[in-house]
A protein has these predicted regions:
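Reductase modules of NAD(P)H-dependent flavoproteins
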Residues: 12-13, 18-122
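Hydrophobic/small residue at the entry helix of a nucleotide-binding pocket
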Residues: 2-3, 96
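Histidine-anchored nucleotide/phosphate-binding helix
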Residues: 3-13
Length: 122
């Protein structure tokens, strides 16, 4: 999330005329890094849409009433209305990034519109 946080902060600070839709997944609610900051930006800057999903809500200490499950092609289709003129940025552990590239491929999103960064070690 850290690279995306920096990109979003820059866009908010400069009030850029660009649309950003962050789809952010964690295992449990307690793992949502920068949650308050992201929510504040989404409320105060109309160009940011924020969707957060939890994959294991039953294991968390905090209740979760939002999206559940992994980010996959079905969830992307549900949340993103139009794939034209969009660039998809993906970062995270290698297996997750690979799964996201496959999901985007199933949606016929060309690899030229997908930017990835794999973080190892977690």
């Amino acid at each position: 999330i850290t690279p995306f946080r920096s990109m979003i902060k820059y866009a908010v600070d400069k009030n850029l005329n660009t649309q950003i839709h962050l789809i952010y997944s964690n295992s449990i609610p307690e793992e949502i890094t920068f949650e308050g900051e992201l929510e504040n930006w989404a409320k105060s800057w109309p160009n940011l849409k924020l969707d957060m999903a939890i994959t294991k809500p039953e294991e968390g200490k905090e209740p979760w009433n939002g999206l559940t499950g992994r980010i996959d092609e079905k969830l992307i289709q549900k949340l993103v209305s139009d794939f034209n003129d969009k660039i998809f940025w993906v970062c995270g552990p290698p297996l997750m990034v690979d799964a996201m590239e496959q999901a985007l491929g199933k949606l016929n999103i060309s690899s030229g519109k997908v930017r990835v960064e794999k973080f190892t070690g977690y």
